[in-house]
Amino acid sequence: MRLSWVLTVLSICLSALVTATGTEGKRKLQIGVKKRVDHCPIKSRKGDVLHMHYTGKLEDGTEFDSSLPQNQPFVFSLGTGQVIKGWDQGLLGMCEGEKRKLVIPSELGYGERGAPPKIPGGATLVFEVELLKIERRSEL
């Protein structure tokens, strides 16, 4: 009887531990609006071509990439897999002129492989982004 009770308690503790680590291991995308715009006639959606300025850093503040030194915006189609998943999700519903800070967990960035040599495997990425222009597919 006593052994049965001990095994039950151990089983419950083990289940709680597995559940806790399972949810803790999966971090979510964090989106912070740094600058809002007063007039927003169009918001970014899947399929739009976005013109962005960005600076990417690791959690420790080490910068790994930026469009600012070249003064050349990065242009891509949103929601089509041209960029990391954290961008495809974190840039939806943005207005021209808006600035956001994205904290992207590894699973939505470069994963366990990373992007050597600048981005190690499992890295959380921090991006400061500014949406300069939206081109709607129907306007192309």
Curated annotation (Swiss-Prot):
Q: According to the UniProt entry, what is the EC number of this protein?
A: 5.2.1.8
User: Could you tell me the membrane topology recorded for this protein?
Assistant: Peripheral membrane protein
One Gene Ontology cellular component annotation held by this UniProt entry: endoplasmic reticulum membrane
The residue ranges of the PPIase FKBP-type domain are: 47-135
Task: Please verify whether the record's keywords include Endoplasmic reticulum.
Answer: yes
Which GO terms of type biological process are on file? chaperone-mediated protein folding
Catalytic reaction(s) noted: [protein]-peptidylproline (omega=180) = [protein]-peptidylproline (omega=0)
Localization of this protein: Endoplasmic reticulum membrane
Q: Which family does it belong to?
A: Belongs to the FKBP-type PPIase family. FKBP2 subfamily.
PANTHER family registered for this protein in UniProt: PEPTIDYL-PROLYL CIS-TRANS ISOMERASE FKBP2 (PTHR45779:SF3), PEPTIDYLPROLYL ISOMERASE (PTHR45779)
Descriptive protein name: Peptidyl-prolyl cis-trans isomerase FKBP2
Lineage summary = Eukaryota, Metazoa, Chordata, Craniata, Vertebrata
